[in-house]
């Protein structure tokens, strides 16, 4: 019977790593043998209650002898010693602690044997270390950045809402955020200067053509002041030259076309404006003894048939016409206070030209309407019309066959736009 017991003790020693355990002889004390056998049986029962894959398959753990030896001086036969032994050997570790301990023991075996450690064993340790670092709010010292914030997903955009949401896009190179969120918190400066220069370049070609609502607003008035069309200056110079040539030229042509010359010379056109510019005085041009006088027969006859019903006062509330006329006068550098209007006197059939341009609500007057610049350009710059010798007055003088047509149709002449009357205003 004792031989069977010694054989069982040797088997327990082989399982638990007690290879150095020798079976004592019968002459030795039986108490020490019983204690060792009891300790081996209890450790085997504890290992059976918590199985481990490493212990069963590879049998790598061989430290059960030092871990579960009984304290010295304890008697195994009493009940309190049995309870103490069960409490110490039943649950020494939790299952997770036991597996981690076996894992570390396996790595130690590789180190002791001077063999390369598999990467699968090391990856599990790094994962456990990261989870413990995030849980304990430790800094990731293993990355080499002691003060860097822990980022579980490096390379991902770090834009968050502060709670749960995080951007799913990848961060740019050497940046924390993606292309969408990299400039989110930057204060935007003013618009670049290039855009402003492009706007001015786009606006400058528009200044050559006057809109229909010229004079409404300071910006549009500034455009009118800056605009200096070459056609108007050319016509003024040519008309002044023709006036000088007319005084020295043929008197026979003047006698034949006397009423026509009076009409063309004394229109409120650029020649009258040039005379006002030389005198620098607002004057009233009456027809008493002046050679530049105009009679109502020569001035108003062409329009009496067509504008007899419309020869009434223009409403004072038409600020549009006033602004248009003021913008046209500024191009001829007239003073601001100089105004001009055409008034038909009741006593004498004389057309006076006072120094005011604006119509008053009291007296029936004929106002000068602002020109349409697009129409003026079409009249002055046409492909089929060539500049005659002597200017527009020379054209009228040479075209002496049909003087009635030129009188009855003032709009056909290049300066007909300056005498647009009530039919254009309405």
UniProtKB/Swiss-Prot annotation:
It comes from the Eukaryota. Residues 92-127 form the QLQ domain. Residues 184-222 are annotated as: Disordered. SMART domains: QLQ. Residues 191-202 have a biased composition (Basic and acidic residues). This is Growth-regulating factor 9. The gene is GRF9. Transcription activator that plays a regulatory role in gibberellin-induced stem elongation. It is found in: Nucleus. The QLQ domain and WRC domain may be involved in protein-protein interaction and DNA-binding, respectively. One of its GO terms (cellular component) is nucleus.
